[in-house]
């Protein structure tokens, strides 16, 4: 069966996290909450979340990153968006208490057209989703649009093009058609998107990258 003829649920069963669907998608999202935990914690250490921050998580997946950020808020608010309805559902379940408190909102939406006004958020993050963005350059401009002046955007990934990828990582990049830039390519697309400064963090012994864009 060709990739084009496979349903989203069939692709999910094969392990592609592009858009989790069905019961297999729920299992995948739970696995992501655990497998992304360490790289996310490392990336979040580059931020200082303030109690009154307005935060957006793009591609919120299973909702663990939102949970970790929202518990640091007092008068602030966190919003998660994902174009997978299953992800929105699972994020809401994991963060049910925060949703009821009014500290967290979860929406089904795409990075292609974020349903927010210009200059809405102090901080924006995306964890392990940038590979799948349909038009990375245009989508970065959309992120820049909804970020407040003086705000920061964190792009977090546990693999990037650095010359040290494993054979399995290379196969996955090809198989799932992942967008996987080098450090210099990241700097270039962030600059074109309008970010005033781009800081890149990497971790020795890992293929992790955290691209920090300042507006």
Question: Where are the regions that the model predicts?
Answer:
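C-terminal alpha-helical "lid/dimerization" subdomain adjacent to the S-adenosyl-L-methionine
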Residues: 6-33, 152-212
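Conserved alpha-helix/loop element of class I SAM-dependent methyltransferases that forms part
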Residues: 34-53, 68
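Short alpha-helical
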Residues: 38, 64, 85-86, 131, ...
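Short glycine-dipeptide loop
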Residues: 52, 147-153
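Class I SAM-dependent methyltransferase SAM/SAH-binding core
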Residues: 54-113
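A short acidic, Gly/Pro-enriched loop at the edge of an enzyme's catalytic core
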Residues: 112-123
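A short SAM/SAH-binding and catalytic strip from SAM-dependent methyltransferases
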Residues: 123-135
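A short glycine-rich, Lys/Arg-flanked "PGG" loop and its adjoining helix->strand segment in the class I
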Residues: 137-149
